[in-house]
Amino acid sequence: MELNIFFRSVLEQDTAPIVLCDLEHTIVYLNSAAAKRYEYAGGAALVGTSLMNCHNSHSKELVEKCLAWFAADEKNNIVHESYNPKENKDVYIVALRDQEKKLTGYYEKHEYRTRDTGEFYKFT
């Protein structure tokens, strides 16, 4: 079975927004959570547009610095972008690399820190 089916499912099942971009900052994929979160800016229609359209000049500069750092060494793969106290989450920019470790793009990773208080193994 083709692994891409599994990888896409992992991305789609994640409840955190995932936005994948190529090296030209083109949004190549949004998972369902990202499409919903960024609905105010176009949601799923953002695929194919530039991530830079959504950022101010300072943010654009920081994204470019991240990409330069990623490109400088194959071991440079994650940058802590911000902490959002309202949502109790950290946001990271993560390098995407091919099998030869060549930089191919990046994505924004949201890690929520609020404990899930739901019942374990509750099948509803």
Region annotations inferred by a language model:
Residues 1-35:
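Sensory modules in modular signal-transduction proteins
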Residues 29, 33, 37-119:
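Sensory/regulatory domains in signal-transduction proteins
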Residues 120-124:
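Low-complexity, intrinsically disordered terminal/linker segments enriched in charged
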